[in-house]
Regions:
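Active-site rim loops that border cofactor/substrate pockets in soluble metabolic enzymes
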Residues: 29-89
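A C-terminal functional module that forms or caps the active site or interfaces directly
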Residues: 83-109, 113-117
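ATP-dependent carboxylate/acyl-activation modules
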Residues: 1-25, 32, 46-50, 103-104, ...
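A broadly conserved detector of short glycine/acidic/proline-rich loop/turn motifs that flank catalytic sites
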Residues: 63, 95-96, 131-132
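General beta-strand structural signal in soluble alpha/beta enzymes
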Residues: 58-62, 92-93, 119, 127
Length: 158
């Protein structure tokens, strides 16, 4: 849970760097305590950590993907949800679920894939898989370049 919470905070910071206000959904097969197995408990623990460490972020969970996407459904299930609108940062309980979903959406939509974005390293570095298209290589190069410029500006500020 600690590692997922830290990754969530870093991902939210990345979104803000690109001018996007993060709306974070902590995903699970459970909606707000409807299951009490280790995976659902882990995501509830992530939420508790975020409440302590990053209370200004907008997030809620644990919740299913459709609940994250559909605000009216989320409000019916949890009227006092702290997440407004549609989530734009989806936090998965494990790398398997995240990678499967990422690749399925990428293939099914034919959209431009941005990522995966490597976080928590001292220099801009990102991952390109063998399936990366030229467009994806260009996009990831642009992200690395912006990342380097931001880091340089931060160092100059002290």
């Amino acid at each position: 849970a600690e590692q997922i919470a830290e990754s969530t905070i870093q991902a939210a910071f990345r979104l803000k760097l690109f001018g996007i206000e993060p709306k974070i959904a902590l995903l699970s097969h459970s909606n707000f305590g409807s299951h009490d197995d280790p995976s659902a408990r882990k995501m509830r623990e992530v939420r508790e950590i975020l409440v302590r460490r990053a209370p200004k972020l907008e997030f809620d969970g644990e919740m299913m993907g459709d609940t994250a996407w559909d605000e009216s459904l989320r409000r019916r299930m949890l009227p006092d949800t702290t997440l407004s609108g549609r989530a734009n940062l989806f936090v998965f309980p494990n790398i398997d679920a995240a990678n499967i979903t990422y690749n399925m959406i990428r293939v099914m939509t034919g959209g431009a894939a941005l990522g995966p974005i490597l976080m928590g390293v001292n220099k801009p570095a990102h991952i390109l898989t063998p399936s990366a298209t030229p467009r994806r290589v260009i996009n990831m190069t642009a992200i690395a370049s912006v990342d380097a410029q931001i880091r340089k500006a931060q160092l100059a500020e002290g």
